[in-house]
UniProtKB/Swiss-Prot annotation:
HAMAP family: ArgJ. Substrate binds at T152, K178, T189, E276, N400, T405. It comes from Pseudomonas fluorescens (strain ATCC BAA-477 / NRRL B-23932 / Pf-5). It is found in: Cytoplasm. Keywords: Acyltransferase, Amino-acid biosynthesis, Arginine biosynthesis, Autocatalytic cleavage, Cytoplasm, Multifunctional enzyme, Transferase. Heterotetramer of two alpha and two beta chains. Catalyzes two activities which are involved in the cyclic version of arginine biosynthesis: the synthesis of N-acetylglutamate from glutamate and acetyl-CoA as the acetyl donor, and of ornithine by transacetylation between N(2)-acetylornithine and glutamate. Its main location: cytoplasm. This is Arginine biosynthesis bifunctional protein ArgJ. The record marks T115, G116 as: Involved in the stabilization of negative charge on the oxyanion by the formation of the oxyanion hole.
Length: 405
């Protein structure tokens, strides 16, 4: 059950970016599982990709091709085309070549994306057979349908949209994402597509996406497993009648950056809220670090601890598990006598020991909530980081035990 995640908000169309959805029946007959996205000619495209060494065939191709002109993005669900070797690369290339043939573009202008079961051959003929229907369905108004089309174990589609005015012109930023398990992006299985009608140089666009992803997609984790297929793309169609943004400065860039960051954050947190079997949305906030990296080390150690995650599921304020996780995070010369830990606003540990004012009833009251913040004060410096995660439930085990059956 998704935690605090409702129906999709209004997803504003982006001029110069169209989406079409069709059914290839890859995993289930009749399911719309192929999504084609068309970028206006002259669009700039940026991407961040999984750091998993076993990255999927479509990731390899997309990383190579994103440097050149991009006209189409082709996504299939139900099959990850990962762990498939050279035949997988050939299969991904074939689907791109077929789409290029149907649209009259160069095959290198088509970027492939896949999500689903790892290690199974990509059903190329099924995907090829669905491409014309997806092209016939292309529309700037198909964001919501595409958000559903890219889902796998997700229970709800995920999307966000922002608009702002600059010199009397409306700029739109809209994005969708998918993911519910195998989530610890490190640019899980996570796909994200964000488009804007602003005109942005590729260098500025790439850095904007890197910054946005590092503050959102790269700060979420459900199970600590980094997928073979993670991708997040940012497309700027340049259809808005405004000057090109060529430097990361000025009011237009600042407004665009804020909109992109807000969309990234909303769709990234939606992945956590819809985490497989999740009953809690958990914020792990680490303050007072000597470096940002040690804050991340502590945050991820807490967020990945099975003992903490199961305590969250049980609504059990077992604060000793949090202290143990902080202590094994590998922070050099950690002075535990300076550490304070909070559940919500309740101080559960002060100076490395149980807080004198703490009662079990206070902790239990916080743990009963659907949205919980664990705040850790290291007392070592001025650096801070925040991670978003979930609990670990019976349902998570069931979903993943039965995934291929």
């Amino acid at each position: 059950m998704a935690v605090g995640l409702g129906p999709l908000p209004t997803l504003h169309p982006v001029a110069g970016f169209e989406l079409g959805i069709a059914s290839a029946g890859i995993k289930r007959p009749g399911r719309k599982d192929v999504v084609v996205m068309r970028c206006a000619e002259g669009s700039t495209v940026a991407g961040v990709f999984t750091l998993n060494a076993f990255c999927a065939a479509p990731v390899i191709l997309a990383k190579q091709r994103v440097q050149g002109p991009v006209r189409y993005l082709l996504t299939n669900t139900g099959n990850a085309n990962a762990g498939t070797g050279e035949p997988g690369l050939a299969a991904a290339s074939r689907t791109c070549a077929k789409l290029a043939e149907l649209t009259g573009v160069d095959a290198s202008a088509v970027l492939p994306y896949s999500t689903g079961v790892i290690g199974e051959p990509l059903p190329v003929e099924k995907i090829e057979g669905a491409l014309q229907a997806a092209l016939d369905d292309l529309s700037v108004d198909n964001w919501a349908a595409a958000a559903t089309g890219i889902m796998t174990t997700d229970t709800l589609p995920k999307g966000a949209s922002r608009q702002f005015q600059h010199d009397g012109v409306t700029i739109t930023v809209t994005g969708i994402s998918k993911g519910a398990g195998m989530i610890r992006p490190n640019m899980a299985t996570m796909l994200g597509y964000i488009a804007t009608d602003a005109k942005v140089s590729r260098e500025v666009l790439q850095n904007l996406l890197l910054d946005g992803a590092n503050k959102s997609f790269n700060r979420i984790t459900i199970d600590g497993d980094t997928s073979t297929n993670d991708c997040c793309m940012l497309i700027a169609t340049g259809q808005a009648k405004l000057p090109e943004i060529t430097k990361a400065e000025g009011p237009l860039f600042a407004a665009l950056k804020q909109a992109v960051f807000e969309v990234c954050m909303e769709v990234a947190q939606a992945i956590v809220r819809d985490g497989e079997g999740a009953t809690k949305f958990v914020t792990v906030e680490v303050n007072g670090g000597a470096t940002y990296q040690e804050c991340l080390d502590v945050g991820y150690t807490v967020a990945h601890s099975p003992l903490i995650k199961t305590a969250l599921f049980a609504s059990d304020p077992n604060w000793g598990r949090i202290l143990a996780a902080v202590g094994r995070a590998g922070v050099p010369d950690l002075d535990v006598s300076k550490i304070d830990v909070f559940l919500g606003e309740v101080c559960i540990a002060s100076r490395g020991a149980r807080a004198a004012s703490y009662t079990e009833a206070q902790g239990a009251a916080v743990m009963q909530q659907e949205e919980i913040t664990i705040r850790i004060e290291l007392g070592r410096g001025a650096c801070s980081e925040t991670i978003w995660t979930t609990d670990l439930s019976h349902e998570y085990v069931k979903i993943n035990a039965e995934y291929r059956t």
